[in-house]
């Protein structure tokens, strides 16, 4: 996936598979002279790779277990699958800050790359996911390859994008049986009611903050109805990863005074 031609093909194939389904792809920036050998060169390497899809995530450098070197995208894919499995196969949680079973982050030739958190955050801000050593190596980053060109939550955040795609694919699989049924009010209401029950379950389990599906007349003009097309509209709000947790501290003089004087005269 570090080859621009391959990366372009992978990104092109993530949307409308068989005309219906969406997915995500994980790409690597080459960890050698054809890509980037230092973190300051990663932004340019990402641009040369052509990684810009909201359905793609980009990784740099590589991970090593002893002398064995692995593409970071492969390790991230395994971490993503493990995170999903731990959450009932619902992709609402980011794989970032999860343990990676590696002993070092390296270039292709095995040269160690030791990124501190600020350097890793810089890469995250360029739409690149990496790994840091924080009491053990952890995957680090939440943004898709489309960031920072887009800040739309459903296109920027990998976990949100994956939830959108998963929900959209499930909708197709669930209601495919309804295709070619009479397009009457009963059909529309059955889809709306059934999907809202499913969505309410997501909210109750804290998979997302809100979920509702509606049928709007203005999105279903007579030309569409005559063409056999019905359109529903889903409003959903997966939770955003808590990427920054800030604690404000100040000195409590009243507490000191009360402790020493009892608050009296």
Residue ranges and their predicted role:
Residues 1-174, 211, 216:
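A glycine- and small-residue-enriched flexible loop/hinge signal that marks low-structured segments
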Residues 163-219:
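Extended, compositionally biased non-globular segments
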Residues 153, 157, 181, 185, ...:
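Hydrophobic alpha-helical scaffolding
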